[in-house]
């Protein structure tokens, strides 16, 4: 009788994942056994401690030169891009947890305490008094850690089956988190249902593509698929169909147009802190998976699929900037901005060079911190119903709160790609890599899209600084320590990466993928 061979596990290499997922499991126990009044402090402390501990473990492993390692029967690849993306996710996760934890802006926190706590006539709203007594729904913290752990596995997945499992681990908590908003409950729950239904549909595409590629290559490992595509004795039908379905699932998660239809509604309906978490961290994980799949498994057949993704990038940029111009809700505007930025990121992803890889990863880092800070600022501008997201509410904001208005102005200019911000450097390195790889027409389209996108950022800036505030306009809440820390972190990193980009670019250039 043959014995089952146990997989070799490099525990040092996967310690950051184990810390995050272990803390998520402890968070579930906290919810089960601690009294309600003790849960918030325990969950916040546990989450922040886990993120810092995972970051320290990652730094120690990177310092010891622990790159180019495959573990768990080659299902995970711990290489230089993995370490960069893990570091990015942990840093962005820290900023998002700070936003989620803040209870000073919204009495009792931004998350509903009980699913059946509603306001008068079943309006789906909680009163401030009810919210303050009930407290904050603290299971959002382990849900965020589970999602973050899934994102880390997704970035490192070296076979399609591991990638699919990680996709579900990161997606399911996000579906729940989207429906936990205290204010505008029905809108939040509608967003959660839409995200779940469309996400399940996209996961089915990914899984079907996985099955076809397994039939094509006889394996789900990326290296085996790469070896199969290098040959000429197999059916191209399975390859093209499998790759197409697989990429649809990946592009959906990255909010790339035309697979972006969930993005505006979910960004608008989800709690603002959760929107920031999704907008920053999910995009990092999704493009981490896209980069690995394209560069490891399908580089040999790139001439067959690059034209399709070339067109998809153009469509995504066009949808993002054109529909972004028409929006009157600031969260929906940022959602369409995200679709446009996904197109810019796709430009670097299909370059298939080390410069394209490094540029795309730098862009993800820069965009993530700017986005976290933007949603932190949005959470401060409030009416009696919650955040003031209609653009008219932001008129004259500089006269009511000049500091908040100028911070938001700086962040919008970073998204527009103005020099001395991280957004400018991110676009520059991505477009330079695309030019070097012979994609000049695509870069021209991207530059035009960037110019058009700058218009709707400038529209908000002009509205804040050169319009008169309404007498019954929204108030600007005094941010608590957590929100202040998250916004400050985002602003400082956005400025530093614009002035000293080598701080991150040198790390991003340390090496490519291993398989």
From Swiss-Prot:
Transmembrane residue ranges: 14-34, 40-60, 80-100, 138-158, 160-180, 195-215, 239-259, 271-291, 307-327, 333-353, 361-381, 404-424, 438-458, 485-505
The protein's enzyme class: translocase
Main location: membrane
A biological-process GO annotation: ATP synthesis coupled electron transport
Keyword terms of this UniProt record: Cell membrane, Membrane, NAD, Quinone, Translocase, Transmembrane, Transmembrane helix, Transport
Subcellular localization: Cell membrane
Function: NDH-1 shuttles electrons from NADH, via FMN and iron-sulfur (Fe-S) centers, to quinones in the respiratory chain. The immediate electron acceptor for the enzyme in this species is believed to be a menaquinone. Couples the redox reaction to proton translocation (for every two electrons transferred, four hydrogen ions are translocated across the cytoplasmic membrane), and thus conserves the redox energy in a proton gradient.
PANTHER family documented for this protein: NADH DEHYDROGENASE (PTHR22773)
Name of protein: NADH-quinone oxidoreductase subunit N
Organism: Saccharopolyspora erythraea (strain ATCC 11635 / DSM 40517 / JCM 4748 / NBRC 13426 / NCIMB 8594 / NRRL 2338)
Gene (UniProt): nuoN
